[in-house]
């Protein structure tokens, strides 16, 4: 199973989204909420309260 790059929640096979940056870095996201917070808004997961510790 894959793990979300933002909230570290397990992602079921066949769900979620894989995001590849131009430099080759691969991110996996469980939801659009996680994707937007990391990519678009540039938030750091450890500073967001709803992310698992």
From Swiss-Prot:
The entry's Zn(2+)-binding residues are 4, 7, 30, 34
List the disulfide bonds in this chain.
none
Record-level GO cellular component terms = ribonucleoprotein complex; ribosome
Keywords (alphabetical) are:
Metal-binding, Ribonucleoprotein, Ribosomal protein, RNA-binding, rRNA-binding, Zinc, Zinc-finger
Can you provide one Gene Ontology molecular function annotated for this UniProt record? rRNA binding
Please report a single Pfam family linked to this protein: Ribosomal_L24e
Single GO biological process annotation from the record:
translation
SMART domains given for it? TRASH
What InterPro entries does its record include?
L24e/L24_sf (IPR038630), Ribosomal_eL24 (IPR056366), Ribosomal_eL24-rel_arc (IPR055345), Ribosomal_eL24-rel_N (IPR000988), Ribosomal_eL24_CS (IPR023442), TRASH_dom (IPR011017)
What CDD domains does the record tag this protein with? Ribosomal_L24e_L24
Stretches annotated zinc finger (C4-type): 4-34
Known cofactor(s) = Zn(2+)
* Details of cofactor binding: Binds 1 zinc ion per subunit.
The UniProt function text for this chain reads: Binds to the 23S rRNA.
How this chain assembles, per its entry, is: Part of the 50S ribosomal subunit. Forms a cluster with proteins L3 and L14.
Member of which family? Belongs to the eukaryotic ribosomal protein eL24 family.
Q: Which PANTHER family match?
A: 60S RIBOSOMAL PROTEIN L24, RIBOSOMAL PROTEIN L24
Q: What is this protein called?
A: Large ribosomal subunit protein eL24
Give the organism the record lists.
Methanothermobacter thermautotrophicus (strain ATCC 29096 / DSM 1053 / JCM 10044 / NBRC 100330 / Delta H) (Methanobacterium thermoautotrophicum)
């Amino acid at each position: 199973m894959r793990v979300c790059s933002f909230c570290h929640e397990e992602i079921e096979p066949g769900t979620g989204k894989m995001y590849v940056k131009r430099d080759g870095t691969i991110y996996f996201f469980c939801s659009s909420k996680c994707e937007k917070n990391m990519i678009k808004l540039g938030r750091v997961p450890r500073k967001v309260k709803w992310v698992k510790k």
